[in-house]
UniProtKB/Swiss-Prot annotation:
Family: Belongs to the WD repeat SWD2 family.
Domain of life, per lineage: Eukaryota
Subcellular location(s) of the protein: Nucleus; Chromosome; Cytoplasm
Gene that encodes the chain: WDR82
Protein name, as recorded: WD repeat-containing protein 82
Organism whose genome encodes this protein: Gallus gallus
Source organism phylogeny: Eukaryota, Metazoa, Chordata, Craniata, Vertebrata
Length: 313
């Protein structure tokens, strides 16, 4: 089944899970699309089975809190950042609920975490104005970059380069093998005082970069030239909430939630809004991602919703 405007318009909430007492701050699908794992401000980690459509188990990180949870490539392991007492990144085995390794180094809250799509490398960005490069096999930081402001960062789909959004006005592209030489490309954007950048993602085809903000718009830029292709708005975000924006796996559509529980979808090529879907969420949709392998997506406030199409084109 191919994603089209009509298929997207047909998506409806198939299941809602109320496992959390506070907002879900992040979730991540496993690369095979079979499970999704969430982190929440209530200090819990919930693992869901996407095929059976049910929660499988819940773990807790009471002492440190849990945010920015990401699957690694090894089965049943995740990395996540703390949102409480320290800024160490933790590598957890879900299998026996034991920490495999800690990654200390950041001195302020970690605000970005991206796992390499191809190996055990990952990068983190922090309010201490640094981006750190790590390898899951070693607790020691493999590389460090000092920046002029708050960074957001992400790997490209090949795992060869990463992009850093700095100070909500610049995108810098780095070659992973020689990032200490500085960026090989820098794209300066029009600075907007009204909001901050909250995230950065590559499309699966590597041609586009999506910049999320805590304002009322998101930007789509050309990953090679840095030109702004589209600015998408018209959704509610009056309280400067961090709303996650995502590509569909075919790189054709862009989705974002809003503070009123609706999901807005645009065609990345034409820039036209193709759908507004009502998730009936009780709070702002802070997390939204399409499943990498199956025709389903998930959205979250303090509840988790799984969506399915109601037509089969």
């Amino acid at each position: 089944m191919k994603l089209t405007d009509n298929v997207l318009r047909s998506f409806r909430v198939a299941k809602v899970f109320r496992e959390n007492s506070d907002k879900i701050n992040c979730f991540d699908f496993s690369p095979n699309g079979e499970t999704v794992i969430s982190s929440s401000d209530d200090d819990s980690i919930v693992l869901y089975d996407c095929q059976e459509g049910k929660p499988k188990r819940t773990l807790y990180s009471k002492k440190y809190g849990v945010d920015l949870i990401r699957y690694t490539h090894a089965a049943n392991t995740v990395v996540y950042s703390s949102n409480k007492i320290d800024d160490t990144i933790r590598y957890l085995s879900l299998h026996d609920n034991k920490y495999i390794r800690y990654f200390p180094g950041h001195t302020k809250r970690v605000v970005a975490l991206s796992m390499s799509p191809v190996d055990d490398t990952f990068i983190s960005g922090s309010l201490d104005k640094t981006i750190r490069l790590w390898d899951l096999r070693s607790p020691n930081c493999q590389g460090l970059m000092h920046l002029q402001g708050k960074p957001v960062c992400s790997f490209d789909p090949e795992g060869l380069i990463f992009a850093a959004g700095v100070n909500s006005e610049m995108v810098k592209l780095y070659d992973l093998r020689s990032f200490d030489k500085g960026p090989f490309a820098t794209f300066k954007m029009q600075y907007d005082r009204t909001c901050e950048w909250t995230g950065l993602k590559f499309s699966n085809d590597g041609k586009l970069i999506l910049i999320s903000t805590n304002g009322g718009f998101i930007r789509l830029i050309d990953a090679f030239k840095g030109a702004v292709l589209h600015t998408f708005g018209g959704y509610n975000n009056s309280k400067a909430v961090t709303l996650e924006a995502s590509f569909t796996p075919d790189s054709q559509f862009i989705m974002i939630g809003s503070e009123d529980g609706k999901i807005h979808v645009w065609n990345g090529e034409s820039g036209m809004k193709v759908a507004v879907l009502d998730g009936k969420h009780t709070g702002p949709i802070t997390c939204l991602q399409f499943n990498p392998k199956f025709m389903t997506f998930a959205s979250a406030c303090s509840n988790m919703a799984f969506w399915l199409p109601t037509i089969d084109d």
